[in-house]
């Protein structure tokens, strides 16, 4: 039983150490995902069209582009619906400047979502780390109190009950981690799909 609990407590730390940050980057101990932690996206790894400039950054003042970017990056928008909307826009706005501005809007929108999702994942990971530390401390205390079980049985029972629920919470959250960790990648993939369509129509 102790071995099983030890493996459970080790899961959080093993995942962080095996899938460490690239050399030169400090690992965030609260990052709960096997995917490498990337603080923000780089447009150069997605977009090979015209360079994003102060001019393309003016998308924020363009109501049509602003609303289109929000709709295209909304998780509720199905990919086919999004690509159809994008192609309609391209038919009416084929200029390189317009498409670059739209990509800039999509990129900035995605990056904002990316940062928010990552912050939530870090908070999730911190809760897991703190819970695992609580369990380890209770195990240590139970071990110490068990040296005089009869005198400490009430306290031991109390700690055993708390430990049970701590482990239950830890496991319940761990079962959610894979789907939560995939959420930022969903938006990155969607952005890549849209970028590919726009690049086909960019001179």
Put a short name on every predicted segment.
Residues 110, 117, 124, 128-146:
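Non-transmembrane amphipathic alpha-helical segments
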Residues 137-165:
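Short E/K-rich amphipathic alpha-helical oligomerization segments
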Residues 154-203:
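Alpha-helical oligomerization segments
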Residues 20-96:
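N-terminal Sec/ER secretory leader and immediately downstream segment
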Residues 4-14:
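Sec-dependent N-terminal signal peptides
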């Amino acid at each position: 039983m102790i071995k099983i609990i030890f493996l459970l407590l080790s899961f959080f730390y093993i995942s962080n150490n095996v899938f460490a940050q690239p050399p030169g980057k400090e690992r965030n101990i609260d990052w709960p995902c096997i995917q490498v932690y990337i603080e923000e996206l780089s447009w150069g790894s997605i977009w090979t069209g015209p360079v994003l400039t102060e001019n393309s950054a003016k998308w924020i003042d363009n109501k049509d582009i602003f609303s289109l970017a929000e709709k295209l990056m909304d998780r509720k928008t199905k990919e086919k619906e999004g690509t159809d909307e994008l192609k309609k826009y391209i038919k009416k706005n084929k200029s390189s400047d317009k498409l670059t501005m739209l990509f800039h809007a999509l990129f900035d929108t995605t990056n904002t979502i990316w940062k928010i999702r990552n912050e939530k994942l870090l908070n999730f990971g911190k809760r897991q780390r703190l819970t695992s530390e609580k369990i380890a401390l209770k195990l240590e205390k139970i071990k110490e109190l068990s040296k005089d079980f009869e005198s400490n049985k009430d306290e031991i029972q109390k700690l055993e009950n708390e430990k049970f629920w701590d482990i239950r919470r830890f496991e319940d959250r761990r079962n959610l981690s894979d789907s939560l960790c995939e959420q930022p990648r969903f938006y990155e993939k969607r952005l890549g799909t849209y970028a590919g369509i726009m690049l086909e129509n960019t001179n």
